[in-house]
């Protein structure tokens, strides 16, 4: 059996078990939730165990507390199969001393939320888990720490980057699926296609019991792949499918299918950032579209690393999705979130990492090359100059996040240039 690769949220789980009665770890299928939580559990209930699933569901209906007995922390895997367990866990937490009693994992938002009578406020901690970042999968050296960039100490950075464009294209298409990181070549690449098949054939319908058409689901996924990193509205997605794929999809259908994909954590759009600006510039408030992993986009389009190398514009588009995935993993370990900034005049910043203490950093994503890095640095300085620092902090750092830059370093103008294969939390 493959050995366990440590995850960034391991530390978060340990910390939250010290101060919360229960933790819910949720995220896309195959991203490693169960394996990670197994490392922290003293006893485990697998709700989907085929030998016990029928009995588990019956017990969850008539005597849910009986399923919660066992050494703590007790892991309840795929709890959403029996939503009544939520209230049972909440009740147990209320009537037990101390913290760290339960770990729950879920790969979908339950369809029968009406069976949940209490939100769990104050008892539960919610942790979002995503496919592996490059630091977790071992493809990033971690020589540059995001937390250190937020530090007031202006420490110099330096690291070598040996990643080639071919490496980056492979990592985009392989994705961060833990199982794939133990494989090589085509064996690793096929995992994303298997994930896509599971989504469109089954998961998109199972999430809420609504039967959805596989062909329509595939067409929607293809269109969403073509619109990664954009604020394309549903009407644009409809038009794209109708023109590109010669099939009529109504706006209601797109909304229904998209909402289902969000419930199973396939889609994770990036919210807009609204800073205080010096001028009355209109800021776009629409979310920016992203899959939770770039390999979903390439699998949806049926393409591989070779195709990306022949189309660097598309490669750059999906490289951005990869970087957003990694930045989310690292930012949340620092109690931060990732946003997108764009004005109606077209000035934009690919990622804004905003921490709870009000600190923030501005990030532009560029695949590589001196010209693109220069463009990214210019954009970052332009955005920074527009921020009203009498009403909010100055940015802690400006960073161009690259794929093929040979080094991580700080430019004379203060802008950091960091290869994604050198970054960690």
Located regions from the model:
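N-terminal pre-Walker A segment at the start of P-loop NTPase domains
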Residues: 1-14
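Hydrophobic anchor at the beta1->P-loop junction of P-loop NTPases
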Residues: 25
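Conserved lysine of the Walker
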Residues: 33-34
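Short glycine-rich substrate-engagement loop in P-loop NTPases that contacts/grips substrate
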Residues: 45-73
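Conserved catalytic/switch belt of AAA+ P-loop NTPases
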Residues: 86-110, 118
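Interdomain motor-coupling "hinge/lid" segment immediately C-terminal to the ATP-binding subdomain
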Residues: 114-230
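Accessory nucleic acid-recognition modules appended to NTPase machines
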Residues: 181-359
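Domain-level recognition of nuclease-like catalytic cores that cleave nucleotide substrates
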Residues: 403-425
């Amino acid at each position: 059996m493959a050995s366990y690769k440590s995850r960034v949220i391991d530390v978060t789980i340990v910390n939250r078990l010290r101060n919360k009665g229960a933790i819910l770890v949720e995220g896309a299928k195959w991203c490693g939730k169960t394996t990670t939580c197994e490392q922290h559990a003293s006893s485990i209930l697998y709700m989907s165990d085929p030998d016990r699933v029928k009995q588990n569901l019956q017990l969850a209906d008539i005597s849910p507390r009986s399923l919660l007995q066992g050494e703590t922390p007790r892991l309840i895997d795929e709890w959403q199969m029996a939503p009544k367990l939520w209230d049972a866990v909440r009740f147990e937490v209320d009537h037990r001393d101390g913290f760290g009693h339960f770990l729950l994992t879920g790969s979908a938002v339950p369809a029968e939320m009406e069976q949940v009578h209490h939100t769990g406020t104050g008892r539960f901690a919610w942790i979002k888990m995503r496919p592996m970042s490059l630091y977790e999968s071992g493809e990033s050296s971690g020589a540059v720490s995001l937390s250190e960039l937020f530090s007031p100490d202006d420490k110099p950075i330096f690291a070598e980057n040996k990643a080639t464009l071919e490496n980056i294209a492979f990592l985009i298409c392989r994705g961060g699926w833990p199982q794939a990181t133990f494989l090589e070549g085509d064996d690793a690449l096929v995992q994303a296609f298997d994930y896509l098949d599971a989504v469109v054939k089954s998961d998109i319908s199972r999430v809420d019991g609504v039967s959805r058409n596989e062909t329509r689901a595939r067409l929607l996924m293809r269109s969403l792949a073509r619109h990664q990193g954009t604020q394309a509205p549903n009407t644009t997605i409809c038009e794209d499918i109708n023109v590109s794929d010669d099939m009529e999809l109504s706006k209601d259908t797109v909304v229904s299918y998209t909402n289902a994909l969000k419930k199973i954590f396939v889609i994770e759009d990036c919210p807009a950032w609204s800073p205080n600006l010096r001028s009355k510039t209109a800021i776009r408030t629409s979310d920016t579209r992203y899959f939770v992993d770039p390999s979903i986009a390439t699998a949806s389009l049926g393409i591989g690393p070779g195709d990306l190398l022949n189309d660097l514009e598309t490669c750059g588009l999906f490289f951005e999705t990869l970087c957003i995935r990694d930045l989310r993993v690292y930012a949340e370990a620092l109690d931060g979130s990732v946003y997108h900034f764009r004005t109606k005049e077209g000035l934009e910043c690919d990622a804004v990492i905003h921490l709870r203490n009000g600190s923030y950093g501005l990030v532009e994503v560029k695949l590589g090359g001196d010209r693109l890095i220069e463009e990214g640095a210019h954009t970052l300085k332009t955005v920074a100059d527009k921020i009203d620092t009498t009403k909010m902090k100055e940015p802690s750092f400006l960073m161009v996040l690259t794929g093929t830059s040979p080094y991580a370093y700080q430019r004379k103008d203060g802008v950091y240039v960091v290869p994604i294969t050198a970054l960690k939390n």
